[in-house]
From Swiss-Prot:
Keyword vocabulary terms for this entry: Apoptosis, Mitochondrion
Effect seen on changing residue 57 to A: Reduced BCL2-binding and reduced pro-apoptotic activity. No effect on mitochondrial localization
Major localization listed first in the record, in broad terms: mitochondrion
Residues covered by region (Disordered): 80-103
Record GO cellular component, one term: mitochondrion
GN (gene name): G0S2
Assembly, per entry: Directly interacts with BCL2; this interaction prevents the formation of the anti-apoptotic BAX-BCL2 complex.
Effect of residue 38 to A: No effect on BCL2-binding
Protein name (record): G0/G1 switch protein 2
Source organism of this protein record: Homo sapiens
GO biological process: one example: extrinsic apoptotic signaling pathway
Function: Promotes apoptosis by binding to BCL2, hence preventing the formation of protective BCL2-BAX heterodimers.
Length: 103
């Protein structure tokens, strides 16, 4: 059934057979569902590039946020290490001065 023109005679023939009226309803239901499927597929095809671009932007934003968090964490760690070195220097100087006085 390549064209719609072939469907019309088929529907008339099926309507002529009174016992198979349920089959006509079934074919009509199937045709309507197939048409909805085609329309939804076309909509998805048309809208797909926009959703893909949005996902890509969201992913890039998440990566940038993660990198910023890692940089902040590295700076905090570096600041703590420098503070620890300063305290070690101060404590080391006190220990040397105590030794000099004790001798």
């Amino acid at each position: 059934m390549e064209t719609v023109q072939e469907l019309i005679p088929l529907a008339k023939e099926m309507m002529a057979q009174k016992r198979k009226g349920k089959m006509v309803k079934l074919y009509v239901l199937g045709s309507v569902l197939a048409l909805f499927g085609v329309v939804l597929g076309l909509m998805e095809t048309v809208c797909s590039p926009f959703t893909a671009a949005r996902r890509l932007r969201d992913q890039e934003a998440a990566v940038a946020e993660l990198q910023a968090a890692l940089e902040r964490q590295a700076l905090q760690k570096q600041a703590l290490q420098e503070k620890g070195k300063q305290q070690d220097t101060v404590l080391g100087g006190r220990a040397l001065s105590n030794r000099q006085h004790a001798s």
